[in-house]
Regions:
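Acidic/histidine-rich catalytic cores of soluble enzymes
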Residues: 1-41
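A short, acidic, amphipathic alpha-helical segment used as a generic capping/interface helix at domain edges
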Residues: 15-22, 49-64
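Short, well-ordered coil/turn segments that N-cap beta-strands
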Residues: 26-28, 65-68
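Short active-site-adjacent structural elements
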Residues: 39-41, 78-82
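Short, glycine/charged-rich beta-strand-loop motifs at protein surfaces that mediate ligand recognition
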Residues: 43-49
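Conserved active-site loop/cleft motifs that coordinate metal ions or position small ligands
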Residues: 69-75
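C-terminal helical cap(s) of enzyme catalytic domains, especially alpha/beta-barrels
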Residues: 81-107
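Glycine-rich phosphate/dinucleotide-binding loop and adjoining beta-alpha-beta core of small-molecule
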Residues: 111
């Protein structure tokens, strides 16, 4: 999700439109991460918390995809366990919404 957000921001395309174009039946895992602000662009560094915009994109993805495996990546600046568990709680909370949306609806919306 962060890669989509970073690329969309840096290259000026719509992240939700990109997400709409993904083949729902081929997505089996979603990765969440943070990024850093470079001089002129965002850098997908996986060394900061997941930002609000990426959480919103993730929530949208879960509504479209349904429950899929989700990994929170933190390759640097690893915070205390309490902060990681907070991100896990957010991911689970947002992902729970996907279980309330019938699969036929998700596929129809993605088509």
């Amino acid at each position: 999700m962060n890669n989509i957000f970073v690329s969309a921001t840096n290259h000026g395309f719509d992240a939700l439109a990109y997400l709409d174009g993904l083949p729902v039946d081929r997505v089996h895992q979603v990765h969440l991460a943070g990024h850093s602000q470079g001089r002129d662009l965002l850098i997908d560094t996986h060394d900061s918390p997941v930002c609000d915009e990426v959480w919103a994109l993730y929530e949208n993805a879960m509504a479209r995809l349904g429950p899929v495996a989700t990994m929170i990546e933190r390759d640097g600046n690893v915070p205390p366990l309490k902060e990681l568990l907070r991100e896990l709680w957010i991911a689970r909370k947002l992902g729970a919404h996907a279980q309330q949306v019938p699969q036929d609806t998700r596929i129809a919306e993605a088509a």
